[in-house]
Curated annotation (Swiss-Prot):
The keyword Ubl conjugation does not apply. It comes from the Bacteria. May play a role in photosystem I and II biogenesis. The chain crosses the membrane at residues 7-27. InterPro entries: PSII_PsbN. This is Protein PsbN. Keywords: Membrane, Thylakoid, Transmembrane, Transmembrane helix. It is a single-pass membrane protein. It is found in: Cellular thylakoid membrane. Pfam families: PsbN (PF02468). Belongs to the PsbN family. It comes from Trichodesmium erythraeum (strain IMS101).
Length: 43
């Protein structure tokens, strides 16, 4: 395989993995631990 093809595929896989992990963190079971700082702040 060409080095440019391998690099392109590697970068694409990394972007998809980071996006998937972000969606899992935002909407999956770990989202129960997330806190909204605007709800915590009182004037």
């Amino acid at each position: 395989m060409e080095p440019a093809t391998v690099l392109s595929i590697s970068i694409g896989v990394m972007v998809v993995a980071i996006t998937g992990f972000s969606i899992y963190t935002a909407f999956g079971p770990p989202s129960k631990e997330l806190v909204d700082p605007f709800d915590e702040h009182e004037d």
